[in-house]
């Protein structure tokens, strides 16, 4: 009987050890599953944070900048000396189209845009080479 008691008493610590190992494995598996879930949803969480950031109001934003459909002009922030050149008015005639190897003698519409000299010289060179053909 003493041998059976010793054998039974030796099983208890082994069972406890096995239970502890199983609990540790379960905890590790739960941590791994948690980390996998976190990694699988990272893209969605980033998109959500960015969306919330755009929707949040900061002190520098105005009501007009938060309204959808309002076009914001950031050109002066990106390039400080940049100013937009105005579009030509709708009252002017459109440039003539090339038809049967003839060209309009009217000046190009680029002159209306105040194009820099090198571009105008390039345009004259291109127009001259077309006339020779």
UniProtKB/Swiss-Prot annotation:
InterPro entries on file: RNR_inhibitor
Cellular component annotations (GO), alphabetically ordered: cytoplasm; nucleus
Keyword field: Cytoplasm, Nucleus, Phosphoprotein
Principal subcellular localisation of the protein: cytoplasm
Stretches for region Disordered: 1-40
BP GO annotations: protein localization
PTM notes: Phosphorylated by DUN1 in response to DNA damage which leads to its degradation.
Coiled coil regions in record: none
GO molecular function: ribonucleoside-diphosphate reductase inhibitor activity
Location within or outside the cell: Cytoplasm; Nucleus
Low complexity bias locations: 16-32
Family recorded in the similarity comment: Belongs to the DIF1/spd1 family.
Assembly and oligomerization: Interacts with RNR2 and RNR4.
Function: Mediates the nuclear localization of RNR2 and RNR4, 2 subunits of the ribonucleotide reductase.
Protein name listed in UniProt: Damage-regulated import facilitator 1
Taxonomic source organism: Saccharomyces cerevisiae (strain RM11-1a) (Baker's yeast)
